[in-house]
Design a protein with these regions (language model features):
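Eukaryotic scaffold repeat domains enriched in small/polar residues
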Residues: 1-102
Length: 102
């Protein structure tokens, strides 16, 4: 699966989805990152912490960080209610972020 500009961490499979943290999109000093959610066809359906997924001729366009949500997300864990837990690397000792499903 081609993920332009995305340095990814450990993938997690939940149901028909594949999720992973995008630890950085530029360089290690920019402290950015987001999550990626792919469907069963390996198409990105969401970039929490980033721009909406966009394709041109079936090729994913490099996503843009939203400048606020994460700081080098290093992993993603999912509970039975589909809440997401996101630890962050080199983030100034922040606690993991919990994203509650709505």
């Amino acid at each position: 699966v081609q993920m332009p500009g995305c340095y990814i961490c450990r993938p997690v499979i939940k149901g028909e989805y594949l999720l992973f943290a995008v630890i950085v999109t530029k360089d290690w000093g920019t402290y950015d990152g987001m999550l990626a959610v792919l469907n069963k066809n390996n198409k990105v359906v969401s970039f929490p912490g980033g721009s909406a997924p966009s394709y041109v001729d079936k090729t994913l366009i490099k996503p843009k960080y939203d400048q606020i949500s994460f700081r080098n997300p290093h992993d993603v864990c999912i509970d039975d209610d589909w809440n997401l837990y996101v630890p962050q690397w080199n983030s100034g000792k922040t606690y993991p972020v919990k994203l509650t499903r709505i």
